[in-house]
Amino acid sequence: MASSDTERDGGSPEKHSPVTDKHLEHSDLAKSPRGLKHYSKSRSRSREHKRKTDECRKHRSRSRSKEARRHEVKEKSSKKHRPDDSIDRDHSDKVRERLNSSENGEERHRRKEKRSSRGRSYSKSRSRERRHRSRSHDRRKSRSRSKERKRRPRSRSRSRSKHRHRSKSRSRSREKKKRIEKPRRHSRSRSRTPPSPPAFRGRNTAMDAQEALARRLERAKKLQEQREKEMADKQKQQETVAVAAAGGGSVINVAALLASGTQVTPQIAMAAQMAALQAKALAETGISVPSYYNPAAVNPMRFAEQEKKRKMLWQGKKEGDKSQSAEIWEKLNFGNKDQNVKFRKLMGIKNEEEAATSSVDVESFKTLKQQEEVFRNLDAQYEMARSQTHTQRGMGLGFTSSMRGMDTV
């Protein structure tokens, strides 16, 4: 629409009257605020964009990675260039309008004068300067922001504002003041409660160690003396027990101990009794309990009997020693030679000829005769019982005849 208006103005520069000139001036005045309005819109957009970016920076977390930050920088730079492109397009359109309107130099001169009188040309030049300044300033800002983002992971304190630097200087001065104040407080506390000097601490510990060693040595000496006394008392008790055992019974031993002045404990009494039993067993059997046995756990009389049995078992037999029972079993006669031979084989008797030809006493002869009669009667009864039970089973109950037969026998 702006280009068509300029063409109409350029087509008839001479025919216009002063009324038409006024009308054209009013149209130019109507055109110029459009451009100004358009420029103000782009400016407001850029300002809003800057505010948004500042808010985003404030609310951005420090824990983002480098890649995410680079991506955001690229997006922001692309968004910044978009309003600049729209401004360039508006500027090119205005240049074209001026070129088209250059045919009418007088009108252009009048317009310039009017605009200068109203302050439009000054505002346009100022707006252009501001645009150039804003572009250069934005570029510098983008560069400084990229540098700050690179430097952030190294030290966050560098990327902070100038007020922080001022606060640092203030904090340093405060720290100096605190350092100056601290030793004063410490000195006050020391003056209130004065501790012992450190030089005497080492001496005290050394003295304590020496005293502890001396105490340990004294305790060890006392323990050794007590042990020696106990050993001496035990030896005396053993000697007295041995003397009492050699002298006689337990009553005498206890009396001897009481007479000697030693305290009679139950252990000493038990030892005295066992010593008396050992002496008695030795006097009767001639066998003493060896020293490796506990006298309180071993009965000396039973031990002596066991030793006798062992000697009898492991001692060799003598030829002349034969007991009466052995002679009776050897001379036993069942009235039948076959039975006698079987019996001697079972009993392990070997000297058959000696038993037959040996001289027999009168008493032994009588016993042998009685044994023969007993064995004969037993054989006869066995035969009768066998015949009745095995061969005569069909003969009634078997009480009358069998009992009569037994009576006759």
From Swiss-Prot:
Biased composition annotated in UniProt, kind: Basic and acidic residues: 1-31, 64-108
| Keyword entries, A-Z | Coiled coil
- State if rRNA-binding is listed as a keyword: no
Coiled-coil-forming residues are 204-244
Reply yes or no: does the keyword Coiled coil apply: yes
Basic residues bias: where? 34-50, 109-191
Top-rank taxon of the source lineage equals: Eukaryota
Q: Where is this region: Disordered?
A: 1-204
The record's InterPro entries line, in alphabetical order, gives: SMAP_dom (IPR028124)
Family membership, please give it: Belongs to the RSRC2 family.
Q: What is this protein called?
A: Arginine/serine-rich coiled-coil protein 2
Species of provenance = Xenopus tropicalis
